[in-house]
Amino acid sequence: MTSELEIDNYKCIICDGNRFKEVFNLEKISKKPYRIIKCSNCSMISIYPIPSKDFIQRHYNDPLYPKSAYFRNMTINFKGSPEVRLFLKGLNLIEKFYPNKGKILDVGCSSGIFLNMAKDRGWETLGIDLSKDFVNYTKKNFKLDIRYGFLKDFSFKENSFDVVTLWDLIEHVREPKELLKEVCRILKPEGIVLILTPNQNSLIKKTTNLSYKLSFGRWKTPANVVYDIHHLYYFSKKNITILLTKIGFKTVYIGKEETILNRIIGEESDHWIKKNKFMVFGLRLIFFIAKLTGNKNKLLILSRKKRILTNII
C-alpha cells in the first residue's frame, strides 16, 4: 500500500490539504525529478514539485515548440483540420449561452485560429500567449491583437471582457486558482469562461494507471506518454466544478471530448512507433472504446460568472 506523504510547503488547490499519496515517481519512469501525487482528502492529482516560472517560460519559447506535432494542423491552412471542429463547437456553445457578441480574450491563444474564427463571427478579440513565435505568427498571418506574457502582467480593468477562453491551458499553469480568480475579476457579471482540459477520469488515464500497477512499475512507457511534466494539474469533472464554484462561477455545461491521437504519438519518431507498435495499437483501441462509451480524454467546461460574488476564496 502506498504510504502517505505530508508536504508542509505545498497545499491542494481544491481543499488546502497537505497530505498526499504518490501515484507515479517520474524519476523512475523517465528520469525526471518529479512525482505525480494525489490529495488524500479530495483526490486532486498534481505534479510535485511544481516547475519554476522560468522553466515554463523556457519551454514555451523553445524554437521547436510551435513546430511540434501537437500544432501541426494549427496553422493558417487550418480549414478542415479536425482540431478546428472543437473550436467551432466551443464558439457555438459560447454564443448559445452568451448570444450578445462582445469582447473575447483567449489566454494561451497559440497560433490564433480560435480568435480568427471568433473575429469572423463578429467578436472583438484579444489574445495572450507565452510563445513569442506564436505571437509573431498570429500577428503576421491573422492581423490579430496578440500580446506576449502571463495574464496578470496586463492588469486588465475589472469587468473588461464578456468571454475568456482557456483552451488546453489550465493544466499548464502553476497557480490555476489564482488564474481563475483573475479571470473572474476581469469578466463582466454573467460573463463566460470556457475551459478545455484533460479528463483525469478518462479511459486512457485509468488504463495507464492499471497497466503500471499490474506490471509492478515495469511497464513505464504509457505513463511516460500520458503524464507529461508540462501538465501540472489533472482535473476531474468533480474537482474542476468545485474549484470554479469556489471562485465565483456557476458551471452550465460540461462535455467530454477526444484528443486526436496523432497529436500524442505524432511527437515520436517512426522508430519509436515501430518499437512500441503494441502500445500504439492499444492506444488506438482505447480511444475507440472511449469514443463509444463517452469516457473521452478531454473535459469541455463552460461556466458563468455569478452576478453577486460572496465568500470568494
Regions found by a protein language model. Name each.
Residues 171:
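Active-site beta-alpha loop architecture of Rossmann-like, nucleotide-cofactor-dependent enzymes
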Residues 1-159, 163-167, 177-180, 256-257, ...:
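Conserved N-terminal segment of class I S-adenosyl-L-methionine
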Residues 166, 174-186, 192-307:
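S-adenosyl-L-methionine-dependent methyltransferase catalytic module, highlighting the catalytic core
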